[in-house]
Amino acid sequence: MVRIRLQRMGSKFNPFYKIVVADARAPRDGRFIEALGYYNPQQKFAKVNLEKTYRWLHIGAQVTQTVRNIFSKKGVFKNFLEQKSSRA
């Protein structure tokens, strides 16, 4: 199973996260398939490559709860559902 999840980066007490597509069995900071963006929790800032994200969602990648919260704040799911309904 493929998941869209966070990969911790940064130093101690100064974390930031890459939003990545990875196999569910891979370790948190281990191997990943593709990077989709990043998230800085201290500044509450996230940057997401929408084209890559929509492609992985269309393929059927599962999204973790934390990434789901980030995506909903950015409006990713709303736009994805609009795109999906316009294709049909």
UniProtKB/Swiss-Prot annotation:
Keyword Acetylation found: no
Protein known as: Small ribosomal subunit protein bS16
Family to which the UniProt record says this protein belongs: Belongs to the bacterial ribosomal protein bS16 family.
Natural source organism: Mesomycoplasma hyopneumoniae (strain 7448)
A GO molecular function held by the record: structural constituent of ribosome
Record GO biological process: translation
UniProt xrefs under SUPFAM superfamilies: Ribosomal protein S16
One GO CC term on file: small ribosomal subunit
Keyword Ribosomal protein carried by entry: yes
Gene3D superfamilies listed in its UniProt record: 3.30.1320.10
Key words of the record: Ribonucleoprotein, Ribosomal protein
